[in-house]
Amino acid sequence: MIGRTPEYIVAVRPLKDGVISDNDMTEAMIREFIHMVNGGAMMKPRIVLCVPSSVTDVERRAVVEAAMSAGARKVFLIEEPIAALIGAGVDISKPNGTMVVDIGGGTADVAIVSFNGIVQSRSIKMAGNKFDQAIIRHITQKYKILIGEKTAEKAKMEIANVFDPTGEKKMTIRGRNLLKGLPESIEISDQDIYDAIHENAMEIVEQVKLVLESTPPELVGDILSNGCLLYTSPS
């Protein structure tokens, strides 16, 4: 709905940068999710919610309170890196170290997980939404074409390359020519997306380096052998 609503409808993001930005809307959203699952039954469910690994105690309490107000009987919180590994089918109960880079809409979490817990982690408010805004700015500055968030996200998902762009991967996007005020279609390449988000992506890479530097040698050896799980979700 972002960018497509009439003036009398305001589309909001209940969550921003991984934490609650609008308590009322967050509560309403969770209440709707509960209704979708239990079909309006009177029984209050138990809920598991994911939070970034770096959230404060105050932010955790805000999430729990919103869910309880929405109709939850009990609320369990789980860090997003652990949820990503479980969702990928990784057995986190083993003593082997597993690295995960979870890039969401508001935050990117980097973590080393072993024995059902996080050994080392870092979280940064640099993720999908910031990438989208960087693409919008770049296209505006270079082509004088204003595009929407959904167009930027689509370009990111389809042709982004943050390490070795060739300029051969291309797609057509539509926006408004800021000089003429008229709709216009242009062709962009992976080089455009690289120029827009490379610097932001390197901030996440830096977090990966910092986590590895503070990880015990035995677990680093596991990561060297097993690699890293990269998990991304839509903005």
Report residues per predicted region.
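Conserved Rossmann-like nucleotide-cofactor binding loop
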Residues: 106
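Conserved small/polar residues in nucleotide/adenosyl-binding loops
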Residues: 231-235
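Nucleotide/phosphate-binding catalytic cleft detector across ATP-hydrolyzing
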Residues: 1-103, 111-228
